[in-house]
Amino acid sequence: MEIKFINIGFGNIVSANRIISIVSPESAPIKRIISEARDKGMLIDATYGRRTRAVIIMDSDHVILSAVQPETVAHRLNTKENQEENF
């Protein structure tokens, strides 16, 4: 299996193969997931002090906060997969 990476903003890159979901941080259950990850030391804040717009949940139970919209991250992920299929 080939390792694929995706830019989540400000030069931060994560492994696309390990992403479980990309969600908005607005709902109470997601806020709870963020809080629990912070308590467990599994939270990665990649916002550079800006507002959190996307929460990326990884298969390793890490939770990553991004300042990029969830739709943008998903689009980058889909674009990357489509480019690789064409080669």
Swiss-Prot record:
UniProt-recorded name of the protein: Putative regulatory protein CHY_1489
InterPro entries with a match to the protein in the record: RemA-like
Pfam families in UniProt: RemA-like
Organism: Carboxydothermus hydrogenoformans (strain ATCC BAA-161 / DSM 6008 / Z-2901)
Family per similarity comment: Belongs to the RemA family.
